[in-house]
Amino acid sequence: MKENKIKSSNGGRRMLIVLGTVLCIAAIIGLAVAYNRLRDIWLEQCVITDAAAQVSITDGKMVRADVIAYMFGLKNGANLALIDFDEKRKETMKKIPNIRDISIARQLPDKVSITVEERVPVVRLGIKGEKKDSGRVADTEGVVFISSNGTQMLPIIREAAAPGTDKGHTLSGRALAALRLLETCRDNFRALAAIEADISKPDYITVVLGNDYSIAKIAWDGMDDPSDATQKNLEKQLDHLTKAYTSRIDDSIRVWNATLPPSETRSRKSEVYGGTQKGFL
C-alpha cells in the first residue's frame, strides 16, 4: 500500500516537472515571438522614407553633405537602427583627413543629425626646389590633408625631399618643429613676418622673413622633440632674434644666425661677416 502511494507520488512529481518544462518552453517561445514582433515593429519605424526631412547634415567648406550621407549610407530605404554610426564615423574620418570631428545625434526613432567639423589649415606644405603647389596643408595639430581653398597666403614649410608627409599622416620631428615655429611667429612675433620655413638642413630651420625677404637660420634646444618645455626655448630664441632684427643694427645683413643659445650670442650681436652677409645676433 505504502509502495503504491510512493509510486503515485513520484509519478505526480514527474508530471509536474514535465508540465513545468513544457510551460517554460512555451513561455520562452512566446517571449521570443513577441520580442521579434516588437523588434520588427521598431525597425519599421526606423526606416528612412524622406531623407530630406529625416536626415540633417551640417557640412563644411570642403566636405559636402552628400559625401557624408553616402559614407554613412543615409538614403531612402536605409534603416537607422541597423547603421553602426560609431564605426561609420571612424571610417569616414580615416578616409577624409580634412575632417577633424563628426558629431552624431539620434532623434528616435527615425531622425538623425550630423555635424561635420573640418580642419583649419594653418600652413602649406611643399618640397624644397619645387614651385608647384602640392595642395597639401596642415592644421595646428600637424595633421596633413589636401586643401586649395583660400590657402595661398598661408606660410609654407619646405620639406627636404618628395613626396613629403602624405595626407592623413601627422607632422613629426623637424616638420612639426617648423609648424610650431611659424605658429609662434604668427601669434607672438609678428615683426618677423615669417612666411617660409625650409627644413632641409640638418642643424637648423631656414626661415624667410617677409618684411625684407632676409633669411634667418634658427635652432633651439629640443627642436626635434616639440613640447611645452622646448617651446620656451623656441620663444627665447625668437625673442632674441626679433630684438636684433627690429633694431636694424646693420641694414646690409641678409642672413641672421639664430642657431646659438642666447647666452652665447649676447656678446656677438653686432658681429657681421660682411663678405658672406651673415649676421650673428
Question: Residue ranges of each PLM-predicted region?
Answer:
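Charged, solvent-exposed interaction patches on well-folded alpha/beta domains
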Residues: M1-V55, D66, Y70-E91, R100-L281
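Conserved glycine-rich "GG(E/T)P / GGGxP" loop and the immediately following alpha-helix
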Residues: G60
